[in-house]
Amino acid sequence: MWIQVRTMDGKETHTVNSLSRLTKVQELRKKIEEVFHVEPQLQRLFYRGKQMEDGHTLFDYDVRLNDTIQLLVRQSLALPLSTKERDSELSDSDSGYGVGHSESDKSSTHGEGAAEADDKTVWEDTDLGLYKVNEYVDVRDNIFGAWFEAQVVQVQKRALSEDEPCSSSAVKTSEDDIMYHVKYDDYPEHGVDIVKAKNVRARARTVIPWENLEVGQVVMANYNVDYPRKRGFWYDVEICRKRQTRTARELYGNIRLLNDSQLNNCRIMFVDEVLMIELPKERRPLIASPSQPPPALRNTGKSGPSCRFCKDDENKPCRKCACHVCGGREAPEKQLLCDECDMAFHLYCLKPPLTSVPPEPEWYCPSCRTDSSEVVQAGEKLKESKKKAKMASATSSSRRDWGKGMACVGRTTECTIVPANHFGPIPGVPVGTMWRFRVQVSESGVHRPHVAGIHGRSNDGAYSLVLAGGYEDDVDNGNYFTYTGSGGRDLSGNKRTAGQSSDQKLTNNNRALALNCHSPINEKGAEAEDWRQGKPVRVVRNMKGGKHSKYAPAEGNRYDGIYKVVKYWPERGKSGFLVWRYLLRRDDTEPEPWTREGKDRTRQLGLTMQYPEGYLEALANKEKSRKRPAKALEQGPSSSKTGKSKQKSTGPTLSSPRASKKSKLEPYTLSEQQANLIKEDKGNAKLWDDVLTSLQDGPYQIFLSKVKEAFQCICCQELVFRPVTTVCQHNVCKDCLDRSFRAQVFSCPACRFELDHSSPTRVNQPLQTILNQLFPGYGSGR
């Protein structure tokens, strides 16, 4: 097992090899010291937000193959000065050295004076400014960027400081020196708010008729950022599009927010309530007068009830706008608002109840509160895991290091293009695909279990199996073979394999494989009348089967296609116990990988051995570490007496011809039908141009990965099925887009472009056809 260790600044990354999942953190620190030359006591290791502490293993932190651990180097503490050095330093200061530095320290204020000057800014009342007391204005909020109706209650200006000269230029007050005290009409409970002059303007009150609206005009309109079809706040809007049909009027604009940011191409729903912005000094603002009633608020009677559950019915209990426990509205002074979910809770409804309001500024309800006992602080040990305590490895008395096997490292990716119970080929995995380890076969979805030979369910059938020669009764003839069922072996103590010790039974995986036979299940065995009508089984051959079969690969694992169960029966095996035997025959249109046609196809598709990410780099580092002691022995006096050591090879070495010799890859060519379909898909012409460049540079598998990446649905994060190409040239699954429309969201999931939901969505048939050819059966389970 190997992992990546990267410094916190990201400038240096190294691979650490020869690890196990049972490697202690303190042992990992020693290996990191060899690579980074950092002492263990100066290392701070972080993985997934946790600081790794000594005493734990990589398995405790769930560190997997090729994962990255971050290294933060502690600063080494400076040692205290010796008595002699301290005396010499004191004598230097006494003799006058460093006097200039000490004097400058005495005279320096380090910016404290500037901070005090800002705190001493004095404001005084004034009658200056564009807007006076009691005038009705619009005030822009610093959070939303929306404009709210308010009234000026006080105007202040910045007073002159003692340092400023009392000249005509200094006395002249700019608008930036004016601060307005306002109170909001809609939110009187907020009290008085102090705002700058640039966020205040005369209240908008003139409605612009539809026929007077023009593109490029800046107006004030109502818009809801979260729910575009509902009433929201008032924003400045620059009109970008105007359209009128026989039955509807459509107005689109760019919503202006804070700091010059904006929301583009948003549809304005309330086209009859577009207001003209009152520019300064053009018209006098409205002034509060006893003889005139105050102006009507813009949202009065239009926004509807604030609570959509109880419709603001005071006599109806509600758990949304009232107490979340009892739903009562009484005693509002004894209600607490959660700072996370904004729900209200009575003090006496909590468990346990509270006698008074807590003095803390923030309070969280029991559902939102984080249990501090479950939080692992920096420097603390991990909490005990109940799940890991029940594992066989935790209760075993064996001292064997089981963490070095590739079957224990865990999957880094998972096949999601088809469900786990998928019968038949995996889309995008042709016959002849090779992997070095079983965990890679699991990641591809061809055979998901890491160790088990059969993948299936006793009530559904078997989906795949691995022919690895684990049973002496197996007979492999290439296009057909006799397979031995599972079970009958004592695997207690976390064993991987053992000898036959009891009879096998037609249960679990054995029954699942029997269900693939086209005949009723029978406890005594059965034979299919038409074996081709049976359920397909994906077959993977492992290199360990080479001791019994000439069809096994020389290295790793190889996918050999689809087989069908012809018959199954029980018999006494070579071990003397009852075993279940299965006869499987090949039923695949793709050629066998051991034939000449299969080898030509493998070469045409560019199928080569696939290694885990970082495996070859880790192997190269291992080779270098082996060569170093070998050179030391050759240079020593006893080098001539050393014998030849034989080591078992675990993979391709740098000096082996298998690693150095590169086979010539033939570029994959699309069929004439596929090329015509790509030309017909004009909406995705740019995407196809980028994808087709990979045909010249890499093998068939790279081309398929590029297609997956280019045509991935942004909603379900899978390859698009029944794709809909939008006007903005994004591809979304039809089911995902229909689900979005049912939720009243009519914008593109990728770019928020407003989509036309009045007409039915149409599937891009050319794109769907070519995806079905490249990934046959990928729509299974969708």
UniProtKB/Swiss-Prot annotation:
Compartment(s) of residence: Nucleus
Phenotypic consequence of gene deletion: Mice display a sensitization to DNA damage and replication block, and die in mid-gestation.
Marked site: Histone H3K4me0 binding: C321
Naturally occurring in which organism (per UniProt): Mus musculus
Major localization class: nucleus
Zinc finger (PHD-type): 304-371
Gene: Uhrf1
Residue ranges of the region described as Histone H3R2me0 binding: 338-342, 358-360
A GO cellular component annotation in the UniProt record: replication fork
Protein's recorded name: E3 ubiquitin-protein ligase UHRF1
